[in-house]
A protein has these predicted regions:
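Membrane-interfacial terminal anchoring regions of lipid-handling membrane enzymes
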Residues: 1-823
């Protein structure tokens, strides 16, 4: 009708003056252009004249087929080139009409009559007020995109207020003929295709604006009605002699303690607030490998598994995900953060709370498991920290597998969508908890969080914390891990809670992969380089020229022999790294006629161990090679390879290194070649050996400093070995050995003044002893005491090979003193 066309044209011209949509993905229009040989039909998520006009303007601007046209015929027999899926039944009837669009039925009828014709369906979703890179306002919050079908008035307000903050999501063109089955009427085929498209739009909308919260009470009711929860309630009633109502109230109390209270309005408000906060605290937030997120977000249940450095981790990851155009994930937060004011805000931001331990509380376990299963079933992305708590040392902690286990079991019970784990690495140049961490690194007990901590934290708003790097690691599809572990063939062994003996192996494997992939996405900042270099010096002081030269060496090594393609490295050169360290107040300069010296304070030296440990895994193998030359001027390749083979399993377990033992020889050869090219080793071809530089050369100093990155790790291993050897086979239990090693390490720390608190960390010794047992280097006798044989003595000999005589003598001397004190 001419009147309708005139109104549509007027609406389109009005929108063209005001609306500035962002198109996602950027390559979408070229993908549509590539399939114009077939008729194109745009499938809109919702019926809206405004949405259609916005799409029309986009197509005109990009030279694409227009949605206002017709396809598959002429005049009355033609089909509209745009069909909406969700539409109200009438002007005064807001209920959704779920019948398949008549145009879709007619298209299928045409395709069935003529086998030479095909139609390309292009899904289109328009989000008014969901362009994530723009800051929010209260008016925009009121009329931002949500899950309800908008009334005419609301749509008008959305256009007026959010017109410049609009996103058009264009799906991949798909052949309609490829979606048809051999049997079924056109109406049934259309209904099936429409259902699938609506489901895809729901998943896409959840990924973009967050979950549909209109059914939160339904989710909570479903959790409390679950058979496993009811069974746990019955056990609670029986064991504690509680009436049914009281047991129900206990379960409901647990659920209220756990559950998030996700708010779209709060999320949008926090985007603007956090944007201003980051600008005040940081010099920028860099999000690397964002394309990975785009690849996995659609049609998968995404589980973000970041490392845990700071309380800022919660906010930063949610912020960068939201800025990429995706919904904020539901975050598993420790119950210690459920404090007044803060806890309420975190719930509105998607946090659900988890106790440190479920032991002995079957009802709480059942409620939590069912809540996790419910939010996963609804397609919400989730996030949790597999380390359990924040790392105080800068190293990745050994993973806690509880949440991973519950995620795996939930998927095994109800595998609705593929699950993919997305590791995330946080690289801070300075952490806001620096003062607290220095105290804890120096031996002070960990403090419990309180509202007072929040007030004290406001003081940091006056300080600068450099740049933050958020790097996305290689995703890990759960189905891939299950297949490798033979899980697909063993699902019949699962009980109704998803438990089976083989599931533990899957969980452990998955946990280790996550930690390795986090480390494989590390960010190397100027502060990391300064920490690795200066902590190698006894007094944390160097000539400026030597410091710049060493930083340059590390930068070249990281680029010539990269640890992983996802590792990011600062673009600064050595001199600029020093200047940056001074601007961050990390370095102190001492002027001298023979050349300036650069140093750090004692307190800063303790904190720098944190930043060194963030990237220590990147330097471990090159440093291990350098260790071989501490007491040897020439070393054969086979001796270096044997040393690496002997030590690698222990450093790989401690630092979550990425390579298998089978890959190790090739990795060591590449590193040796890189070190030779950098001039700090000389290749002796005829002897198949390597020679260190002349002792008086700058390269000799560089090699010695590189060795220091891992020498304390080797010293710690040798300390444990020497302690056990001195005590004798069958003399100590694993616990007694660990305690004695810790005391000895503390004494060495006091005598030699190491600025390395983790050197005497009991957990490090526990992990090393446990790995010695698993690898059968030592064994437990019938009394539970440790016994060893020639294999252990060969490990000890290799440890001696890389340590200087002075270091070995010092360790043996302190070990003997400690042994006498214990006897």
């Amino acid at each position: 009708m001419p009147e309708v066309r005139a109104l549509s044209a007027a609406l389109r011209r009005g929108l063209d003056l005001w609306v500035r949509p962002e198109v996602r993905p950027e390559s979408a229009t070229s993908a549509i252009g590539a399939v114009q040989a077939s008729p194109v039909c745009y499938v809109l998520e919702r019926r809206s004249a405004v949405d259609l006009a916005a799409l029309e303007n986009l197509c005109i601007r990009e030279g694409l087929p227009r949605p206002s046209g017709r396809i598959l015929g002429r005049r009355q027999s033609a089909v509209h080139a745009a069909i909406p899926l969700l539409r109200a039944r009438g002007i005064f009837d807001p209920r959704i009409d779920r019948r398949p669009p008549a145009e879709l039925v007619r298209m299928i009828e045409v395709l069935e009559r003529d086998s030479t014709i095909d139609v390309r369906l292009v899904p289109i979703a328009v989000y008014w007020g969901r362009a994530p890179q723009k800051e929010g306002s209260w008016w925009r919050l009121l009329f931002t995109e949500n899950w309800a079908l908008a009334s005419g008035f609301r749509k008008l307000m959305q256009v007026l207020i959010n017109g410049r903050f609009t996103m058009i999501e264009v799906g991949e063109p798909v052949s309609l003929r490829s979606l048809l089955l051999e049997s079924g009427s056109p109406a049934l085929q259309a209904a099936r295709i429409a259902r699938a498209q609506r489901a895809a739009f729901r998943r896409q909308r959840a990924a973009r604006i967050g979950p549909d919260l209109s059914h939160r009470r339904t989710i909570l009711h479903r959790v409390l009605s679950a058979r496993a929860v009811r069974a746990a309630m019955a056990a609670e009633m029986r064991d504690k002699k509680l009436p049914r109502r009281r047991a129900l109230m206990v379960a409901k109390g647990y659920l209220e303690e756990i559950a998030a209270n996700y708010s779209h309005v709060f999320i949008t408000f926090m985007e603007g607030f956090l944007g201003r906060l980051w600008n005040r605290l940081y010099d920028g937030v860099t999000f690397n490998h964002a394309e990975t997120l785009r690849d996995v977000a659609q049609d998968r249940e995404v589980v973000f598994v970041p490392c845990h450095r700071s309380h800022m981790d919660y906010l930063l990851l949610s912020y960068v995900i939201y800025k990429q155009g995706y919904a904020v994930p539901h975050i598993a937060a420790g119950i210690n953060l459920n404090i007044p004011i803060v806890g309420r805000f975190l719930r509105k931001g998607g946090a659900f709370f988890i106790r440190r331990s479920f032991a002995g509380n079957a009802l709480y376990t059942a409620v939590f498991m069912k809540y996790l299963a419910a939010i996963m079933a609804r397609g919400h992305s989730i996030e949790y920290f597999v380390e359990g708590g924040r790392s105080r040392t800068g190293r990745l902690l050994q993973p806690k597998t509880g949440m991973i286990s519950m995620t795996v079991r939930s998927h095994l019970r109800d595998p609705r969508r593929p699950v993919v784990f997305v590791p995330v690495y946080f690289g801070y140049e300075r952490i806001v908890e620096a003062g607290t961490y220095v105290g804890e690194l120096s031996g002070q007990p960990k403090r419990k969080e309180s509202i007072g901590d929040l007030v004290r934290a406001l003081r940091v708003l006056r300080e600068k914390f450099g740049r933050v790097h958020v790097n996305v690691g290689e995703p890990i599809p759960l189905d891939e891990v299950l297949q490798q572990q033979g899980g697909d063939e063993r699902r019949a062994e699962l009980d109704e809670e998803g438990r089976a003996p083989w599931v533990s192996a899957v969980v452990d494997d998955l946990a280790q992969r996550i930690m390795r992939n986090i480390n494989s996405a590390a960010a190397v900042t100027p502060i990391n380089l300064l920490a690795v270099t200066l902590l190698a010096m006894p007094r944390q002081s160097m000539a400026e020229s030597d410091l710049a030269r060493q930083c340059e060496l590390y930068l070249k090594l990281l680029r010539m022999a990269p640890y992983d393609a996802r590792v990011t490295v600062t673009d600064l050169d050595g001199a600029a790294v020093i200047a940056y360290g001074e601007s961050m107040k990390v370095l102190q300069r001492q002027t001298h006629k023979l050349g300036d010296l650069v140093r750090v304070s004692d307190e800063m030296a303790v904190l720098l161990t944190y930043y060194r440990n963030n990237v220590l895994h990147l330097f471990t193998l090159p440093s291990l090679i350098a260790c071989a030359f501490i007491s040897n001027s020439v070393v054969r390749t086979e001796d270096i390879q044997r040393l690496a083979w002997r030590v690698y399993p222990y450093v790989a377990s401690e630092l979550f290194l990425k390579w298998t033992e089978q890959e190790l020889p090739g990795v060591m050869r590449r590193l040796l070649d890189a070190l030779a090219e950098l001039g700090i080793l000389e290749r002796l071809e005829e002897q198949d050996a390597w020679r260190r530089p002349a002792p008086s050369s700058p390269q000799s100093l560089q090699l010695s400093l590189l060795a220091q990155a891992s020498v304390q790790t080797i010293e710690r291993y040798y300390l444990a070995i020497a302690t056990l050897m001195h005590a004798g086979s069958g003399a100590l239990t694993a616990r007694e050995l660990s305690e004695r090693c810790q005391l000895t390490a503390q004494r060495i720390n006091m005598i030699y003044g190491f600025n390395s608190p983790e050197f005497s960390d009991r957990a490090m010794f526990d992990n090393f002893i446990s790995l010695l047992l698993r690898r059968r280097v030592i064994r437990n006798d019938e009394a539970g005491r440790l016994v060893f044989d020639e294999v252990f003595l060969r490990v000890a000999a290799d440890a001696e090979f890389v340590l200087s005589e002075q270091i070995r003598h010092s360790i043996l001397q302190v070990t003997q003193v400690e042994s006498i004190a214990q006897s």
